[in-house]
Amino acid sequence: MSVLMILKASGDPAKMEEWANANSEVMQKILGHAREHGVISHRFYGGDGEIVVVDEWESEDGFREFFDHEEDIPKMMQTIGAGEPQISFYRPLNTNDEI
């Protein structure tokens, strides 16, 4: 069963967008590695001084293997001045109301 991964870090969402647009090849490389480890869906969100990543993964282990060995993510986070990421995982609940 898949898991939802939520990553939150302090940072400027505009800097994240700027970096991603200026480094699209690096972003695609990271995405390719994520696919190899089982990402199902991925999206960045931004709020007041916060960057949030919402992903669905085949497994928590797949995400951890990807994140622990992906060298470009720490470089990107340092460049944009993001804070230490807080990562949480959630499992789907069987509530008979999925859309």
List each language-model region with its residue ranges.
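Short S/T/G/P-rich N-terminal loop/turn motif that feeds into the first structured element of a domain
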Residues: 1-71, 79-99
